[in-house]
């Protein structure tokens, strides 16, 4: 594939999603080029990201369900032992970092950690295998293979990472209102960090406090999602650049980078999970 097109085309092809959306003048369709995908705008759907994220979510649920169903009280098998270690690891972090009373946080944290880890893990797949297979399938169906895009790492798509982070943001708002009441939540946004005993001064400070607190609040999901996206996108881009090099250089660079990347994909899943726990813990605290 790399020999048939330019390096620029190769990189652009690997960084373009399989996109379905409304193209002005042509109606609803699958994008044939990166330019068409961009012109489809915000409402376009990245079909590959949806397919892989949902598919890996099903794999996660099925795997844990099967292990739980076959779990024994005696000496556990290797898979059961690994699952138990993950569950205990997440549960320990929740107990140490979450000060609220909700029983939802531990299973939520476990879901976030394992799901993101599985999505990140796709970055270790050989860069061309699945996309080239998708191109061959597309060609067999009568499509131009160069117009077939198929990314396999959902966390390199900001729509996925920001979608997860804003779901966490919705939980932050929910727990803030649940624990503090609507009045307490509004007061937290308008009466801090600056306060005054004089009623007039307090009213004057309300918009200033709101701007500062709102920026702090909205920065949480944005930074949470973009941090995961940025790290994974950069990792994928490096793999793409390595794939453009001569074969003997590819092995010399890809193996150590893949080994190092194992740390990155695990760390990014852990960071997302921990920040979620911390944010929800702060939202559950009744004192500012």
Curated annotation (Swiss-Prot):
The lineage of its organism: Bacteria, Pseudomonadati, Pseudomonadota, Gammaproteobacteria, Moraxellales. GO terms for cellular component: plasma membrane; proton-transporting ATP synthase complex. It is found in: Cell inner membrane. GO terms for molecular function: proton-transporting ATP synthase activity, rotational mechanism. This is ATP synthase subunit a. It comes from Psychrobacter sp. (strain PRwf-1). It comes from the Bacteria. Signal peptide: none annotated. F-type ATPases have 2 components, CF(1) - the catalytic core - and CF(0) - the membrane proton channel. CF(1) has five subunits: alpha(3), beta(3), gamma(1), delta(1), epsilon(1). CF(0) has three main subunits: a(1), b(2) and c(9-12). The alpha and beta chains form an alternating ring which encloses part of the gamma chain. CF(1) is attached to CF(0) by a central stalk formed by the gamma and epsilon chains, while a peripheral stalk is formed by the delta and b chains. InterPro entries: ATP_syn_F0_a_bact/chloroplast, ATP_synth_F0_asu, ATP_synth_F0_asu_AS, F0_ATP_A_sf. Gene3D superfamilies: ATP synthase, F0 complex, subunit A. Belongs to the ATPase A chain family.
């Amino acid at each position: 594939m790399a020999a048939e097109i330019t390096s620029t085309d190769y990189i652009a092809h690997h960084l373009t999603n399989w996109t379905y959306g409304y193209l002005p003048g042509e109606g609803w369709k699958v994008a044939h080029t990166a330019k068409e995908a961009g012109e489809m705008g915000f409402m376009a759907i990245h079909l590959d990201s949806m397919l892989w994220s949902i598919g890996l979510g099903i794999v996660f649920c099925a795997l844990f369900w099967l292990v739980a169903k076959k779990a024994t009280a005696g000496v556990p098998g290797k898979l059961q032992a690994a699952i138990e270690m993950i569950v205990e690891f997440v549960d320990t972090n929740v107990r140490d970092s979450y000060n609220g009373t909700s029983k939802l946080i531990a299973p939520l944290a476990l879901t976030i950690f394992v799901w993101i880890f599985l999505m990140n893990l796709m970055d270790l797949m050989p860069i061309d295998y699945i996309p080239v297979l998708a191109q061959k399938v597309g060609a067999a169906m009568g499509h131009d293979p160069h117009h077939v895009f198929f990314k396999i790492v959902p966390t390199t798509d900001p729509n996925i990472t920001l979608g997860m982070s804003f779901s966490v943001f919705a939980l932050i708002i929910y727990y803030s209102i649940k624990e503090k009441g609507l009045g307490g939540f509004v007061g937290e946004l308008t009466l801090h960090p600056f306060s005054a005993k004089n009623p007039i001064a307090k009213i004057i400070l309300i918009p200033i406090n709101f701007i500062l607190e709102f920026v702090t609040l909205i920065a949480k999901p944005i930074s949470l999602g973009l941090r995961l996206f940025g790290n994974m996108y950069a990792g994928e881009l490096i793999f793409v650049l390595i794939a453009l090099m001569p074969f003997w250089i590819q092995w010399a660079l890809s193996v150590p980078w893949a080994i190092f990347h194992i740390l990155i994909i695990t760390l990014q899943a852990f960071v997302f999970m921990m920040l979620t726990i911390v944010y929800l813990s702060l939202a559950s605290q009744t004192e500012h």
